[in-house]
Amino acid sequence: MANIINLWNGIVPTVQDVNVASITAFKSMIDETWDKKIEANTCISRKHRNIIHEVIRDFMKAYPKMDENRKSPLGAPMQWLTQYYILKNEYHKTMLAYDNGSLNTKFKTLNIYMITNVGQYILYIVFCIISGKNHDGTPYIYDSEITSNDKNLINERIKYACKQILHGQLTIALRIRNKFMFIGSPMYLWFNVNGSQRRMKAEREIARKNCGGNPCERELKSERSNVKRLEYQLDAEKEKVKFYKRELERDRYLSSRYLTSSSDPHEKPLPNYTFPRIKNVSPLTTEATGSVEVAPPSTDVTEPISDVTPSVDVEPEHPPAF
């Protein structure tokens, strides 16, 4: 069995039959998870990850013999990147034709913006990989570019393909708000690609597209508006509390004043209470300024009352407002 290094270098492996077992397992997995909705905590199980891993490895092993005049002078793995070789790959052919082409038929009905179920997610990402096509339908590398010596061109093509794999999955993750669903891209899509830079760039592009454009920004503005509305309501409630406290103080003040000056010997005054004092006016006199001694309570009153000699600046006959 050829190892990955030999496959990469174009060393032709011993002819092997297509591993139909991995295709059968893949078909069963898709049927099993096709209607399973992706929730916030949904992830791909270890069993299903192993099946995906086997499918991609079997696809890589089955690449056809490369033409001597159709190899990359830059060492790029064109056997997995171009339609010229992928369409000759027996594993790819078998996968598309399996079960009367049911998998390929389902794949053609999907796009990155409508995926909501686990089976749809797995089928779409895996078929994009083994078909050598980006999510926008363009090939990883055009057949005419197989023998290109333009290093920048080939590197940019592969970087774009790698970005599309990350971009598509990040788009789904942000839309569904799930951070556990992910299928890693095969190693040949990382040819001359800086992984950390590519990941950060893809995340920035997704954030700019989704949050700077529509849904995230609208949700954020809505949340900010709700917070402001609640703050206004809280301030209004605080003002109400202050108002009721002032009213309570005023009522207690008036009650104490009239009770302490009452001639009814059986009327019980309020308990001792210290009133706010405002300079130069007494509410118990007809003078604009001055103070009045409050008469002591009736001797029949059992509870003592302290002298009240408020001095406030208000008109006579009218209590002060607090």
UniProtKB/Swiss-Prot annotation:
Residues covered by region (Disordered): 284-322
Residue stretches spanning the membrane: none
Superkingdom classification of source: Viruses
Pfam families assigned: Pox_A30L_A26L
Family statement: Belongs to the chordopoxvirinae A26 protein family.
Function, in words: Encodes a truncated version of poxvirus A26 protein.
Protein name, entry field: Putative A-type inclusion protein
